[in-house]
């Protein structure tokens, strides 16, 4: 570990260590950010919430078909598992597990993924599908660090990742084609169109990505698309509809010590929403109808010494519902939000036999969840903001939860901001945990945590420098664990959480050509879990001169547990990436990217070695 730290410091000292932090750069002023895509529309300087924002410029400069690698680099405390060049997969051997401050789980049921504020998760398993997070559809990404259950309910126990989709602000047409090719026969392609004329606007995109993978039998292929439509009835009312669809085929060769043959997945996901919004001087709100469904077909594979399986796992699931909220400002500095949510989720899972035996049903369940919430925020003299919220959430099987939240934000001299927050997070058990497979237990109750947080931030030199530090403590109970009961495995509410940590970030716009960025997180877990590193550091520099832009990032990871039985901790490692863009014309841009320049040998999923140095090059054409 000491050698890794010395090497990392050497990279910093030589000026070749580049990174991107979690704040938005706006015309040389950092930190003045409005949260646009969530139910909590506000200036971040007047809210006790800790929110990281990744803008479109950062997403595009990464040239990655998936949003998750970019998010994981730029947000302190957030970690996403990976197993190869492209694709995360599902089921056995899958990656894409997300954890924030040690909360998330495997699979990810304690961290909520949303698109334009609408939850996205598999109706039976209760977790998001990592491979639906396409970069092409994102205008920005907002990451709420810490419990967000008052506004978002179950699964927002550790935080919320909200993908804000593209919306044209001015009349015109924007078209873009991006094509790149690289190591291991990896292809990334995307085409997008954005249009606005008068009251009507639209955004559409399609993508195709594939790779052979850096190991045999680790191929991945994906096709997807999205469509957004909007219409402004008046200055106060507008309606929007959007849909996303993706299909991918993923293969898993198994770990090095336990290889698997023919472990292949065919997954199709579809999501749509219909949104009616209103906006007046003293009030604004929305009514949202949403629908999410999936079709999964999986061959669980077999080990070399076994015979092929005579069945295939099949499932179809759905998650649908409605949400409504309205914000009121009764007088200056006042903001009251009231809202309600309804979710219906479930599906059917079965094993289909190849010899025409009758299907074996493993689940055929549906459940409902209904909730109401209220959040009050009051700002006094632009100096002190008090925030308090409460949510009542009822699950048709697991019962009722009360969720409180309180916080304050204080504006100090010299543009310093002090914030304090106490919030409860929770998640209801999933249908899988209660009714599927041998560990199931229908008597499970909700997991819950309490999150205590203190933060300090400051802008210097007219906003050219921004830094922030967060200290937090998390205490949780009734975490669902699989343990032997009467000689058989069973899911029971027995686990505990006790985490504390520190997060820090720095961004400095030195000049129009140079900027430096960094973020760091330290996590101490009394009860260790996988995919939550103790140390996570990302630092760097960006350089722009005329038509040329160069960026790179070095990330140091240490204290990463890859499995708990037996307890296995990966040695500290450094990942150094670099990219360059050159604008030949206003329409044509060429780019290249190199990942893992140091050819570091490491694993994130136990038994799945990650690729060494990889290359990617391509072009972007705007017309």
PLM features: residue spans?
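Surface-exposed extracellular loop regions of Gram-negative outer-membrane beta-barrel proteins
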Residues: 249-251, 295-297, 346-347, 351, ...
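Outer-membrane beta-barrel signature, preferentially recognizing the C-terminal barrel domain
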Residues: 256-279, 315, 365-367, 415-417, ...
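Short strand-turn segments of transmembrane beta-barrel domains in outer membranes
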Residues: 148, 160, 164-195, 204-206, ...
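Flexible loop and strand-edge segments within Gram-negative outer membrane beta-barrel domains
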Residues: 211-218, 222, 236-319
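Gram-negative outer-membrane beta-barrel transporters
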Residues: 379-381, 471-475, 492-560, 587-589, ...
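Extracytoplasmic beta-strand/coil segments of soluble accessory domains associated
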Residues: 69-118
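Short, acidic, small-residue-rich periplasmic hinge/interaction motif at the N-terminus
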Residues: 20-60, 68
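Short acidic/polar hinge/loop motifs at secondary-structure boundaries
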Residues: 118-145
């Amino acid at each position: 570990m000491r050698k890794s730290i010395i090497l990392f410091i050497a990279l910093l000292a030589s000026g070749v260590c580049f990174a991107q932090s979690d704040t938005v750069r706006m015309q040389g002023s950092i930190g003045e950010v409005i949260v646009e895509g969530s139910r909590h529309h506000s200036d971040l300087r007047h809210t006790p919430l800790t929110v990281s924002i990744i803008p479109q410029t950062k997403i595009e400069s990464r040239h990655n078909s998936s949003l998750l690698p970019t998010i994981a680099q730029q947000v302190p405390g957030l970690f996403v598992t990976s197993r190869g060049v492209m694709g995360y997969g599902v089921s056995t051997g899958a990656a894409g597990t997300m954890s924030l401050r040690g909360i998330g789980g495997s699979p990810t049921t304690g961290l909520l993924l949303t698109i334009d504020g609408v939850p996205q998760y598999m109706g039976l398993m209760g977790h998001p599908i990592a491979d639906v997070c396409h970069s092409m559809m994102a205008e920005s990404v907002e990451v709420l660090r810490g419990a967000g259950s008052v506004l978002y309910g179950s699964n927002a126990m550790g935080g919320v990742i909200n993908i804000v989709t593209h919306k044209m602000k001015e009349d015109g047409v924007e078209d873009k084609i991006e094509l790149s090719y690289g190591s291991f026969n990896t292809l990334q392609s995307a085409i997008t169109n954005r249009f606005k004329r008068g009251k009507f606007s639209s955004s559409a995109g399609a993508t195709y990505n594939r790779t052979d993978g850096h190991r045999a039998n680790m191929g991945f292929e994906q096709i997807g698309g999205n469509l957004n439509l909007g219409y402004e009835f008046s200055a106060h009312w507008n309606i929007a509809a959007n849909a996303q669809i993706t299909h991918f085929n993923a293969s898993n060769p198994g770990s090095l010590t336990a290889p698997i043959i023919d472990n292949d997945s065919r997954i199709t996901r579809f999501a749509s929403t219909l949104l009616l919004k209103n906006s007046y001087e003293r009030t604004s709100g929305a009514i949202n109808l949403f629908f999410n469904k999936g079709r999964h077909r999986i061959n669980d594979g077999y080990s070399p010494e076994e015979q092929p399986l005579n069945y295939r796992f099949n499932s179809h699931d759905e998650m649908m519902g409605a949400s409504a909220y309205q914000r009121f400002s009764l007088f200056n500095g006042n903001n009251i939000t009231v809202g309600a949510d309804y979710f219906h989720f479930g599906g059917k899972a079965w094993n289909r036999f190849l010899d025409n035996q009758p299907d074996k049903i493993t689940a055929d369940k549906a459940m409902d969840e209904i909730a109401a919430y209220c959040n009050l925020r009051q700002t006094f003299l632009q100096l002190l903001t008090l925030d308090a919220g409460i949510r009542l959430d009822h699950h048709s099987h697991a019962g009722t939860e009360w969720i409180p939240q309180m916080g304050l934000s204080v504006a100090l001299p010299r543009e310093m901001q002090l914030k304090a927050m106490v919030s409860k997070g929770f998640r209801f058990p999933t249908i899988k945990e209660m009714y599927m497979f041998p560990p199931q237990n229908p008597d499970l109750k909700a997991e819950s945590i309490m999150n205590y947080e203190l933060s300090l931030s400051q802008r210097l030199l007219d906003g050219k420098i921004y830094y922030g530090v967060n200290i937090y403590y998390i205490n949780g109970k009734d975490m669902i664990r699989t343990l032997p009961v009467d000689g058989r495995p069973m899911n029971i509410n027995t686990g505990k959480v006790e985490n504390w940590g520190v997060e820090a970030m720095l961004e400095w716009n030195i000049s129009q050509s140079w900027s430096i960025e960094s973020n760091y997180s330290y996590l101490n877990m009394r009860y260790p879990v996988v995919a939550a590193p103790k140390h996570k550091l990302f630092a760097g520099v960006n350089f722009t001169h005329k038509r040329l832009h160069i960026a790179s990032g070095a990330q140091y990871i240490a204290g990463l547990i890859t499995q708990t039985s037996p307890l296995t901790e990966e040695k500290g490692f450094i990942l150094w990436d670099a990219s360059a863009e050159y604008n030949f014309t206003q329409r044509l841009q060429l780019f290249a990217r190199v990942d893992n320049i140091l050819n570091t040998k490491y694993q994130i999923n136990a038994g799945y070695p990650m690729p060494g140095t990889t290359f990617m090059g391509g072009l972007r054409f705007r017309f």
